[in-house]
Swiss-Prot record:
GO terms for cellular component: cytoplasm; cytosol; Gemini of Cajal bodies; nucleus; SMN complex; SMN-Sm protein complex. Widely expressed in embryonic tissues (at protein level). The SMN complex catalyzes the assembly of small nuclear ribonucleoproteins (snRNPs), the building blocks of the spliceosome, and thereby plays an important role in the splicing of cellular pre-mRNAs. Most spliceosomal snRNPs contain a common set of Sm proteins SNRPB, SNRPD1, SNRPD2, SNRPD3, SNRPE, SNRPF and SNRPG that assemble in a heptameric protein ring on the Sm site of the small nuclear RNA to form the core snRNP (Sm core). The keyword Phosphoprotein applies. The lineage of its organism: Eukaryota, Metazoa, Chordata, Craniata, Vertebrata. Keywords: Coiled coil, Cytoplasm, mRNA processing, mRNA splicing, Nucleus, Phosphoprotein. Transmembrane segments: none annotated. InterPro entries: GEMIN8 (IPR034754). It is found in: Nucleus, Gem; Cytoplasm. The gene is Gemin8. This is Gem-associated protein 8. The modification Phosphoserine is found at residue 122. It comes from Mus musculus.
Length: 238
């Protein structure tokens, strides 16, 4: 397996691709530096004493997430309360009106929740008796037509998905592969094209391939310079 991996990885380790890999590593270093800078800014923002005094942290900060575990359903396991609430120390002579008001509002919320649960339970218990429902011929035709429409729409969606997968943009060739993968390429660039040219033109394949490459390079150069807009391939009907 190791020998096969070296054989497949040898062609893109060629020095001719060194400049590409150099740009690739520079881009990866820039992305990692950007992520580190964003992480540091996020940590400093959420731990700033001027923005969040008295230890009040937003629910999506790292310190808040570390101090509050989550269960398997993604719900909070601690007491459900606002993460922005700040707990100030009470003075000895301070009245307890705020706490009594909070307890009263909590009881009111619990009572409303219980009423909503009872209403939802009573709604779930309502059942429709369809045993005496009259099924006419018009209703049967309606159901049959609805089922036909659903089947036609399902087939049309499948055809649209297949057509979209096979669609090739105007700025790409017929052999353009738009599927992305993290795996290294299994064959060398132009290997399939060279084999096809060899099969078609025999010993004259290198000469014809060089001419085609020159024409393609000239076309790409003028396209990069002029930036033309591709005309849609639409048949004209007179």
């Amino acid at each position: 397996m190791a020998s096969n991996w070296r054989a497949s990885a040898s062609w893109y380790s060629h020095p001719v691709y060194a400049r590409y890999w150099q740009h690739y590593h520079h881009a990866m270093l820039w992305m990692q530096g950007h992520q580190n800078a964003y992480r540091k800014f996020r940590d400093s923002y959420f731990t700033s004493p001027w923005l969040f005094p008295h230890g009040a942290l937003p629910w999506n900060s790292p310190a808040y997430e570390a101090g509050h575990p989550w269960d398997s359903q993604g719900q909070h396991m601690a007491q459900q309360e606002s993460p922005y609430r700040v707990s100030h120390p009470k003075s000895p002579g301070q009245p307890l009106r705020n706490s009594s008001r909070t307890q009263a509002s909590t009881r009111g919320n619990e009572a409303r929740c219980e009423e909503e649960e009872l209403e939802s339970d009573s709604d779930d218990e309502v059942e429709c008796d369809l045993s005496n429902m009259e099924i006419t011929e018009e209703l049967r035709q309606y159901f049959a037509q609805t089922e036909r429409h659903r089947e036609e729409r399902r087939r049309q969606q499948q055809l649209d998905a297949e057509r979209l997968n096979d669609y090739v943009n105007a700025d790409h060739g017929l052999y353009f592969n738009h599927r992305r993968s993290l795996e290294p390429p299994s064959e060398k660039p132009w290997e399939r094209r060279q084999a096809e040219m060899k099969r078609l033109y025999g010993n004259s394949a290198p000469k014809i391939l060089a001419m085609e490459t020159a024409v393609q390079l000239s076309f790409d150069k003028h396209c990069d310079r002029k930036q033309p807009k591709y005309w849609p391939v639409i048949p004209l009907k007179f």
